[in-house]
Amino acid sequence: MKNEIINYIKEVGPVTMEQLADQFGAGSAKSFTDLVKLVSSMEGQRKLVFDQDGRIALPAPKVTRNRVTLQGIFHAHKSGFGFVTIVEEEDDLFVSRDNVNFAIEGDRVEIAIKKVADRLKGTAAEAEVIDILEHSLKTAVGLIVFDEDRPEYSGYIKSKNQKIAQKIYIKKSPLVLTGTEILKVDIEAYPNKKRDYFVATIRDVVGHKDDVGIDVLEVLESMDIVSEFPDEVLAEADRAPESPSEKDFEGRLDLRDEIIFTIDGADAKDLDDAIHIKQLKNGNLELGVHIADVSYYVTEGSALDQEAIKRGTSVYVTDRVVPMLPERLSNGICSLNPNVDRLTQSAIMEIDRKGKVVKHWIGQTVIKTTFRMTYSDVNDMIAGNQEKLATYKAIVPSVELMVKLHETLEAMRYKRGALNFDTSEAKIIVNKDGLPVDIQLRQRGIAERMIESFMLAANECVAEHFAKLDLPFIYRIHEEPKSEKLQKFIDYATSFGLTVYGTASSISQDALQDLMERVKDEPYADVLNMMLLRSMQQARYSEQNHGHYGLGAEFYTHFTSPIRRYPDLLVHRMVREYGHNPAEKAEHFEQVIPELAKSSSSLERRAIDAEREVEAMKKAEFMQEFVGQEFDGVVSSVVKFGLFVELPNTVEGLIHVTNLNEYYQFHERTLTLQGEKSGRVFRVGQPIRIKLTRADKMTGEIDFAHVPSELDLVEKNLKAKRKTMSHSNRDRDDRSGRGRGKNRKKEAVGRDSGRHKSGKDSKSKSGATDKKKKPFHKEVAKKDKKKRR
């Protein structure tokens, strides 16, 4: 909401508190008080000021030596230049390599404007870093390298982060280093005019370069994602009981006689959610979503709680999970294993035929699950597998009701404008040595979508319950997309000849739904879906309820995964505490929620970054075996420096413009590259044949080369033939005749080279090369086989 306030004042000028309250709907005493506190907080951060008339205004830009200066966050590019994001500005400011002045990725900097943007000429603003207010890089991880030229240091490490070019030299250490150690170091000094490198001290030896899984561990440690728990945290977890006692059941609704079951992946160990479902006499359905009561064992302020706050979320990478809580809890007392008593928090909803929750109850329960189901079990039952239907005969009626309710809820969400971002997701299979052996597409059957649907219903129900009680609460919000990003998506969609109903500022979710429905069977549907997703804002946690745009929901929170997300744990705590003494606890939660929401959002982004970096690294490592092979893909993105192409197994690589056969001009509005001579156009969603030329595990980068199609080769041969005929005509007109044979010989070699390259070589690449190395993906292999036939 801070950005919305800033943008509003930027647009209309200084305002009174009453004007601000009207603009943001702060009509109740509670919401007005919240707004006053927020404005006060922003004043303390120098984001707002009060002018001489007592109105709320933006602070005047600081002027240093007759220059306007601003503060922002520096984002580096591996080529040396960068951009600065200013909270109060829409566009980032470009900083050339000469004006970076030793700022590094993530630094909070002060900048001076060197050149003002000129929208008529299409030129962007440029800035110069004049001061580094706060360094972001505090630690680094890397392999020790000895340097005889600097004997005053133990050596240096080079960060894997491509945006940090400088070496990190390490102060002399009593440790005996062999050159195989992966070190974690604390930065003590930063590059400056006198010294073009960092200086650091050793904090820890993470491992050795040939250790199994050290590559993944290096990524995690570089982001301060630590697997090991402190001793006091483990000791506290060990004090949790093996099973709850009768005393623990006091004040809880006893649901042990209900048919309740879990549905998870086959390899899941932390079974933290379960459901029950039944038909009521009035025709409505009762859905119970039961979540492990983690907050009963993780009390506020405890060592477990403090560690969970620091971690924010569990992190899932290819070969491991870095949990938010010790396994003693997640796989033990907080896992809803079958036929044992477990403490839970439940949302029990009565849902009518239209998918509306007409009654609900939220509170503490005790349950005993009857079955531990897997997604494949349930999908088989839905598909009519007789063996599974016989094995789980007792819950067949429940599964039938689940399918019915899921369809109702899905239709309800679609009707209210929920957007379906159904993108392909990779599952990287690694062996015991941590090496990738396969990349598969994650499958999402009806069972997976049903459980997701029921969890969404519970999250909405809990959020609406506390919003209407007007109590301090933490929400999961997804704000409306910014109009300029949505405009880029609309421009892009229309470049396919699609009609988009509405403008960037007025387009409805219904119109976006309609658009995606119209293209769902087109070859570019997945890419258009991804482009729409990229136009959205990031979902985050907030003490203010702004609804969830993507879900079309007025109220939303996270209630269903307290084992792996701290906001869910906090919600469970509020459910309990507000049930006992809401007035007393409201003030406390009002104070702690804003900071917890902010830190949880930040830690979630860190986890996503780690997961993406490990995935890119493992994909590149997997593809190294297939360098030189050709495959079919789809253009997934077009930028001024080239094309990104995605293969059927979700691997993405770059065809750089310098590897195309002519000069290509980039058209930003349509996101296309057009050949200057041929007029050929590359666009997103276009099928393309590529050759894998490079796969770099260290950087996670993959490079492709474009393989011309048969049509390209025909055109090329026709042009060569026309050129030859033109030369022949000139030769006949040449009276002297000298050089005629030489020219013809050169032309003949050129034609033979062209045929050889497009004929024999192409056949060898698509045939012999593929036979020499096994195809990396069954779908691609089938396509290649069909083409050879």
Task: Show where each model-derived region lies.
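Short, flexible surface segments
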Residues: 105, 178-179, 627, 632, ...
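Intrinsically disordered, low-complexity linker and terminal regions at domain boundaries
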Residues: 107, 127, 656-702, 707, ...
